[in-house]
Amino acid sequence: MNRFLEFSNNFLEVAGNTINNISSKSITDNVGNVWGNITGGRVGQVYDINGRRVTEVKLVAEGGFGFVYLVRDDYNNMYALKRMFIQERERLEAMKNEIDVMQKLRNNPNIVKLEGFKINENRNTRETEVLMLMEYCSGGSVLDIMNARGEFTRLEEREILAIFSDVCNGVLAMHQQQPPIAHRDLKIENVLYCEHSNRYKLCDFGSSTIKTFNTATERGKAEDDINMFTTLFYRAPEMVDLYRGQIIDEKVDVWALGCLLFKMAFYVDPFDGGSLQIINNNYKIPDNSKYSNNFHKLIQFILVADPTQRPSINDLLNYLNEIRGSSRRGLQTFSSNNNNSNNNSNNNSNNNSNNNSVNNSSNSINRPIRTSSSSNSTPNFNSPNTNNNNYNNNNNNSKNYGNTPNSTPPNAKKNIFDILGDDTTSSTSNSNNSPSVSRNNINNNSNNFNNNNNNNNNNNNNNNNNNNNNNNNNTNNNNSNNNNYNNNNNKFDEFESWGNTPLQHPSPSNSNSNVIINNTNSSGKNNQNKSNSGNGNFFDNDFEFEGFVSPTTNGSTNFEVNTTNTNVSLNSSTHSSSSFNNSSNNNNTNNSSVSVGSSINNSGTRLMNNSSGSLPQSRQSSFNSTPQQQQQQFNSSTNSGSYNNLTSSFNNLNISTSSSASISSSGGVSNNSDNSWNVTLTPSQSNKNSTGNLKPLNNNNNNNNNNNNRFANNTNSSRDYSFDFSSPNTSNNNDFGSFVQPSSSSSLNTTHFSKPNYNVNLNQTTSMTNNYNNNNYNNNNNSNNNNNNSKVFDFGIL
């Protein structure tokens, strides 16, 4: 009995001492272990890294030297924590080197970001704990993605090139350091996909070094270092055969990139036979390869046994930039949309500006989770998405091809290789500068395309009282559809197939909902110059205005204008109201306003260019016409027949307060001729009464289409539509020179027009009260205005 009591007292004493020695950290560890046994993982341990407190969420990966955990900070931000226990001094130095490299490359978008680190040395156990807090890449490694795809759904060429491009940019950042840093362990396990940034990133820099080995004198030292820090199947020949006496430097990474590219494509290592196969550079592309010849040539370009002949990382990126083809653009993974763009060459211009609505949603694929020792994340195998980028698309040719093994559908997206350099780089350019490694505006949801080929052979002509000749023979198709883009595209769509057939680049998208004026004509000239000089006179070619003809003796109601002495003023005034965008031919791209006449009063100016301009309300234009009797009204609200002629005639007309014209009318229809224009206002049959005369202009709104385009009819019946028989205004004659020539008398009932200098008051037909930024004035025959509150002029002539 006494022995039992003695044993009990000793037990209680030991237990009490144990309880007193338990620290809070031990309690946390024990609780975490218990909770881990319940949930299947060790969860709950708290770490303090450089003042940042993080808590374990789950175990992500486990390797021979440590573990990778998913952790959460106090602000619910997720990170990857790499925890290692190291006893060898060489391994500890390698970890310190990895931390140093990651700190240098911390801000590179293709390098896994190091958030913090902590090194705890235990002198008693001679073991060192290394903690590295890094950004969490939830997409897993490339190995995880390939395994999840399986044998029969291998990576597509555009996907491989997307991954490869990001990896090359990460390697470029390392090789640009002084001295250059060689990764020396590039493989698919060390490439992670980060879904939040939509990028592939390099990790595991434990093998990286700035050392350069001259194997002739440092053979033994190099051999130990290579065997410890590199993987056999990715080693370059100079690393395998040290007796070659070749220098081992950063070009070993280029060789490893070739092996990585080969394995992503064919799921096998190119040199799985070992050292002898590497030394002989003996690899074979499978006969059943589904990839293009350009892809095979890319592998051959990289895998060069002699390091002195092997390309550098800059050469590799330049080669990628060359073979991509500047006239081909990005692809679409799951849907195809044919987008026609504007190609304005010197001789032919097909203006099919079709902005088609695109909705590309990536397919989600449920795949098993596979972790690797080098991964700091769990894979999420949904196809990565990327949004649109703003760019300038300057192309010469555009073709559309169907789906083939070597091509994939086009997409209204920027090509990924535009990231590598300037977008205007041609397919044959070879820049010595390294391309840009940033992919900007990933979350920008609007695509602004600017398809302008400034290849016009225009003679430099004087705009004042000169006859101008244009060397462009243009054929224009008047098809302009203005729709909205809604893009949600796959990241891999940024790549073309690299096949033997070029792909169509995306069509221009007009994100501005302001005024659209299409300069659509049968044989006009393209005013594409970036300045006001050398554009020629806007009125030197009557075909630019279609129905604008010279004075005639017989014809329908005509605005007859002699443009021989026309003054064209290229004003620099811009306004914050409606914008006149030329979407058909991208003409008048100069940043200046164009108006007829050099004299402008306070009423404002009708502008037409691609800059912002205003259409002021209640403006009066002096047409210098002398009606001898009051004319009946014309109602052009039917939007048909000669009303279309009216709208197309005013495509390029800039009416200022000093514009002038004379009016004559007769029974026939005028023919086109040079140096003048004609506006045919033929009333519809529904607007005539029983006697054949025209009905009064009605005040009802007329629907042009489902978007409820409203005609600018008079809403105030108390105002007069008649001509203003005020004193003749001759001040404008000096502004327009001989802009108006009196036409010979013609008969239509008793109507005669014989002399100028009377004002035509267009106040009632041009008065707009809505917000100009929401208006759309589209003076094109075949224009579909999808913007609300679109207004078309309805001229009531009395």
Curated annotation (Swiss-Prot):
InterPro entries according to UniProt: Kinase-like_dom_sf, Prot_kinase_dom, Ser/Thr_kinase_AS
Binding site for ATP: V60, A61, E62, G63, G64, F65, G66, F67, V68, K82
EC class of the enzyme, as a word: transferase
Source organism (scientific name): Dictyostelium discoideum (Social amoeba)
Kinase found in the keyword field: yes
Family: Belongs to the protein kinase superfamily. Ser/Thr protein kinase family.
Pfam family name, one: Pkinase
Chain intervals with Low complexity compositional bias: 335-406, 429-490, 506-538, 557-603, 611-642, 659-678, 698-716, 770-790
Lineage, highest ranks first: Eukaryota, Amoebozoa, Evosea, Eumycetozoa, Dictyostelia
Membrane-spanning intervals of the chain: none
Reaction catalysed by this enzyme: L-seryl-[protein] + ATP = O-phospho-L-seryl-[protein] + ADP + H(+); L-threonyl-[protein] + ATP = O-phospho-L-threonyl-[protein] + ADP + H(+)
Catalytic center residues: D185 (proton acceptor)
Region of interest (Disordered), ranges: 330-538, 553-645, 659-798
Protein keywords: ATP-binding, Kinase, Nucleotide-binding, Serine/threonine-protein kinase, Transferase
Stretches assigned to the Protein kinase domain: 54-324
Record-given protein name: Probable serine/threonine-protein kinase DDB_G0276461
One of the record's GO molecular function terms: ATP binding
Enzyme Commission numbers on file: 2.7.11.1
Domain of life: Eukaryota
Sequence ranges of Polar residues compositional bias: 679-697, 717-769
UniProt entry tagged with the keyword Nucleus: no
GO CC list: cytoplasm
